[in-house]
Amino acid sequence: MSRIVNVKLSLKRYEYEKPFHITGSVSSESRNVEVEIVLESGVKGYGEASPSFRVNGERVEALLAIENAVREMITGIDVRNYARIFEITDRLFGFPSLKAAVQFATLDALSQELGTQVCYLLGGKRDEIETDKTVGIDTVENRVKEAKKIFEEGFRVIKIKVGENLKEDIEAVEEIAKVTRGAKYIVDANMGYTQKEAVEFARAVYQKGIDIAVYEQPVRREDIEGLKFVRFHSPFPVAADESARTKFDVMRLVKEEAVDYVNIKLMKSGISDALAIVEIAESSGLKLMIGCMGESSLGINQSVHFALGTGAFEFHDLDSHLMLKEEVFRGKFIQDGPRMRVKDQ
């Protein structure tokens, strides 16, 4: 009764509450692919892919075009053999977000068959996590207003997007710190700086007495030497995001001693590689945060359960659904301000 009898993909569009601006990109909507896995028992498991051309080279149209191929890959397999399904979907090399969605939908269906939740299948290490909330690139004045609003909403970790104007970025962080005292800051350049600019930014902020908890992806993804340079010349811990898409990327980063943190995103790695990265981190002393692309509440649900289950993360950047207009909340978790916890069955 636990065998897969059908797999369906469908396009979903979500409008942002306001345009979301990061280095080199402004988004007004998120176009995602919803995955539905149907079992012979009638149980349905759900996942969501939020493809990024900028990070993964994925297009929504390409994901939808391989619906039949994905269906053929896993139809007839019992979801209790989820490791087998993971192994098969690892072959979706060019479609990491779809791989993540199919793998989670498999676990979602299995958890329903077993009368439990995905976070418990993954270990059940934590009952609650706390997310940050993001300030996109804007004028200094607007960034400060947004950060103050986020702080007043109860968020104590604030993510600040930078990378397009060094002088304004330094000023924005300084002014944000004045109105959000007691908050922790994750600063994300999204590959926007050169090595020299990245170090200049970090030192300027440090000299103003501002502490940054995580300095994320300051340089280009392929510039591993640059990440290492910034790490050893910056007063703040450096994280890889775009440079860390697969477990093999992370192994190289560890070998090169290039970063202090890696930002796991299921949309980059799928569940299978994400689990491997957790093991690599635990073995090497690498610290972890977990992030997102443009997922709705259905997609963020995947990362929330992964984080609750593994308990592997120091920081949680799971706020994309808070920026989108959704008619119905579809996460199997309770959102209480920044806190996210398991929803009772």
Swiss-Prot record:
Pfam families xrefs: MR_MLE_C, MR_MLE_N
Lineage top rank: taxon: Bacteria
UniProt KW Metal-binding keyword: yes
Enzyme Commission number: 5.1.1.20
Ligand binding (substrate): 134, 159, 190, 292, 317, 319
Pathway info: Cell wall degradation; peptidoglycan degradation
Keywords assigned by UniProt, alphabetized: Cell wall biogenesis/degradation, Isomerase, Magnesium, Metal-binding
InterPro entries with a match to the protein in the record: Dipeptide_epimerase, Enolase-like_C_sf, Enolase-like_N, Enolase_C-like, Mandelate_racemase_C, Mandelate_racemase_N_dom, MR_MLE-like
Family annotation (CDD domains): L-Ala-DL-Glu_epimerase
Signal peptide: none
Catalytic activity: L-alanyl-L-glutamate = L-alanyl-D-glutamate
Function noted in UniProt: Catalyzes the epimerization of L-Ala-D-Glu to L-Ala-L-Glu and has probably a role in the metabolism of the murein peptide, of which L-Ala-D-Glu is a component. Is also able to catalyze the reverse reaction and the epimerization of a broad range of other dipeptides; is most efficient with L-Ala-D/L-Phe, L-Ala-D/L-Tyr, and L-Ala-D/L-His.
GO molecular function terms attached to this record: L-Ala-D/L-Glu epimerase activity; metal ion binding; racemase and epimerase activity; racemase and epimerase activity, acting on amino acids and derivatives
Name this protein carries in UniProt: L-Ala-D/L-Glu epimerase
Family designation: Belongs to the mandelate racemase/muconate lactonizing enzyme family.
Active-site residues, record numbering mapped to chain: 161, 265
Classification via SUPFAM superfamilies: Enolase C-terminal domain-like (SSF51604), Enolase N-terminal domain-like (SSF54826)
Organism name: Thermotoga maritima (strain ATCC 43589 / DSM 3109 / JCM 10099 / NBRC 100826 / MSB8)
Top-rank EC class of the record's enzyme: isomerase
Cofactor-binding details, from the entry: Binds 1 Mg(2+) ion per subunit.
Chain residues that bind Mg(2+): 188, 216, 241
GO biological process: cell wall macromolecule catabolic process; cell wall organization; peptide metabolic process
CC cofactor: Mg(2+)
